[in-house]
Curated annotation (Swiss-Prot):
Family named by the database record: Belongs to the eukaryotic ribosomal protein eS25 family.
Region (Disordered): 1-37
Keyword match Cell membrane: no
Self-association state and partner proteins as the record states: Component of the small ribosomal subunit.
Organism annotation: Ictalurus punctatus
Name of the protein this chain belongs to: Small ribosomal subunit protein eS25
Primary localisation category: cytoplasm
Keyword line: Cytoplasm, Ribonucleoprotein, Ribosomal protein
Presence of the UniProt keyword Metal-binding in the record: no
Compartments it resides in: Cytoplasm
Function of the molecule: Component of the small ribosomal subunit. The ribosome is a large ribonucleoprotein complex responsible for the synthesis of proteins in the cell.
Annotated Basic residues bias: 27-37
Pfam families attached to this UniProt entry: Ribosomal_S25
Length: 124
């Protein structure tokens, strides 16, 4: 019986020797390929208002909860500069209310009927 054990020990040592070179030599890693990148469609936004868009501005924009030039530009498909000018016009007419003004971002919200009428009474 003891000779059989010695043979098994020799076999296991041979197996370990065979496995070691395989573990040491790793396969070469694949080169990472460059991605093509994302392609964006060109925006074709209006530079000046047409009648339909101007009506939509007065009808829909005062009902938005959050009003910024970016939101108006995206929804009405107009340029950012045109959206800023339009929001200033709506503000001057009292249709929207200024929330925050920063050099880079202006935020407006819709006028609630109670605060719009109540504000002039307190001043007078």
């Amino acid at each position: 019986m003891p000779p059989k054990d010695s043979k098994q020990k020799k076999d296991t040592s041979k197996a370990k020797k065979d496995k070691d070179p395989v573990n040491k030599s790793g396969g070469k890693a694949k080169k990472k390929k460059w991605s093509k990148g994302k392609v964006r469609d060109k925006l074709n936004n209006l530079v000046l208002f047409d009648k339909a868009t101007y009506d939509k501005l007065y009808k829909e924009v005062p009902n938005y909860k959050l009003i910024t030039p970016a939101v108006v530009s995206e929804r009405l498909k107009i340029r950012g500069s045109l959206a800023r000018a339009a929001l200033l016009e709506l503000l001057s007419k009292g249709m929207i209310k200024l929330v925050s003004k920063h050099r880079a971002q202006v935020i407006y919200t819709r006028n609630t009927k109670g605060t719009d009428e109540g504000a002039p009474e307190k001043e007078a």
